[in-house]
Amino acid sequence: MEYTARMNEHALVSRAAAAGSCVLLKNVENTLPFAGTKDEPVRVAVFGIGQIFTPTGLTGMEPWRKIGILDGLTAEPTVKPDALLAHKYRAWALEHPEGSELPLGSLSMEEFASMNDSAMIVLARSAAHYDPKLTSFEQDMIRKVTGAFSRVALVIAAPGYMELPPEARNCGAIIFLGLAGQEAGYALADVVSGKVCPSGKLSFSWPETLESFGLTAQQLDGFFGYRYFDTFGGEILFPFGYGLGYGKAEFSSVSVGLDGCEVTVSATVENTGETYPV
């Protein structure tokens, strides 16, 4: 592929779009952002082979470069991925290009927890190998990481819904990165470092279990997508349109009016966050 000057401009657009599309599903006890400085970066132990083999998009297209999650975090001066753990994953990836996971037996969770402030777990699925259910290995990895670290962020780099068992929901923060394109690693680094406030919203309802999806012919009728759950019920973890941010706001004077078929909703919204205004 021939390089052109416009590629850098396109990369900046791709990076901004990917960062703005990140959906923050959960964030408790200020797990995110990893608000470090250049002099005192936040030390993060990153787990999951998806940090190396980060899926970028659908098959049939090949971007001129791919920035994986580990590379993106490494380039961010306020975040410092654990060097030893990163070396283990890079070496394993060279020997196992098929994308198999690094065995947990070769890792000392307690040792990494003592040397780092936080942990990040990457769950990755490409469009060609999309399975919404976590493997037993992934569940075990989450249990061991959350058992050793008190501050854990879970990143989902997948085409869509992933079933989140209880151990996954125990993570302090959950980010749906999706298939974020060639700048995925840089975009995620912008979000977790606090340079960009996540503003993405879910375009679908996120149920508790995969079985909640009705296995029927996909027809664009009145009950398609999120309307199915609105009509027929089911346990929903995150509803259609859901997405958190780092800022805080207070709502008051909420009123709803109905005039024939016209519904009017009004409210007063006040920014209460200092660092990240809504």
Spans of model-derived segments:
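C-terminal non-catalytic regions of proteins with extracellular/luminal or membrane-system context
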Residues: 1-278
